[in-house]
Amino acid sequence: MNLVPTVIEQSSRGERAYDIYSRLLKDRIIMLSGPIEDEMANSIVAQLLFLDAQDSTKDIYLYINSPGGVVTSGMAIYDTMNFIKADVQTIVIGMAASMASVLVSSGAKGKRFGLPHSQVLIHQPSGGAQGQQTEIEIAATEILKTRKMLNGILAKNSGQPIEKIQADTERDHYLTAQEAVDYGLLDGVMENNSKLK
């Protein structure tokens, strides 16, 4: 059961009811929560493009609580974050795992935050293949290319050497918010929203 709260606002013209996500969008807040897949990515991309077109001089706030998901869907969000002019502030609430860790680390420099009890998980991409031997080889080659690409992004975003990223993503590597700051994936731990600019 998916319940989306409704917010009622008063104006001189009467009352207006919004779903909570539409109301947050008015304040340039986008919620990325749950597994990253095509439908969610399309919604996030559309919101980023809309807010950038509305005013590219104002920051966009992307709150992330996600176990990760489909790499190509995540890369659509990543590319859009870099494509638009507006700075995207990223804030981890809960968990930013796998592809979500790439996204949270890709926020505007100096504007990547985590709440005190949030976590970041980095690891290598996973996938599966079946079929003929040549199809399995093609899939294996592709996942190695994907891993190299994601490790490169994490290295660029964190300032860590690629060799450290490769070693740390060999297995699940959990980081508290403060550890993610020390690692270079985040810029600060937020106790309250006073750090948001």
From Swiss-Prot:
Active site: S98, H123
GO molecular function: ATP-dependent peptidase activity; ATPase binding; serine-type endopeptidase activity
PROSITE patterns registered for this protein in UniProt: CLP_PROTEASE_HIS, CLP_PROTEASE_SER
Chief site of localization: cytoplasm
Transmembrane feature ranges: none
EC code: 3.4.21.92
Reactions mediated catalytically: Hydrolysis of proteins to small peptides in the presence of ATP and magnesium. alpha-casein is the usual test substrate. In the absence of ATP, only oligopeptides shorter than five residues are hydrolyzed (such as succinyl-Leu-Tyr-|-NHMec, and Leu-Tyr-Leu-|-Tyr-Trp, in which cleavage of the -Tyr-|-Leu- and -Tyr-|-Trp bonds also occurs)
Matches recorded under Gene3D superfamilies: 2-enoyl-CoA Hydratase, Chain A, domain 1
Subcellular location field: Cytoplasm
Family: Belongs to the peptidase S14 family.
Assembly mode: Fourteen ClpP subunits assemble into 2 heptameric rings which stack back to back to give a disk-like structure with a central cavity, resembling the structure of eukaryotic proteasomes.
HAMAP family: ClpP
Free-text function comment from the UniProt entry: Cleaves peptides in various proteins in a process that requires ATP hydrolysis. Has a chymotrypsin-like activity. Plays a major role in the degradation of misfolded proteins.
Name of the protein: ATP-dependent Clp protease proteolytic subunit
Natural source organism: Limosilactobacillus reuteri (strain DSM 20016) (Lactobacillus reuteri)
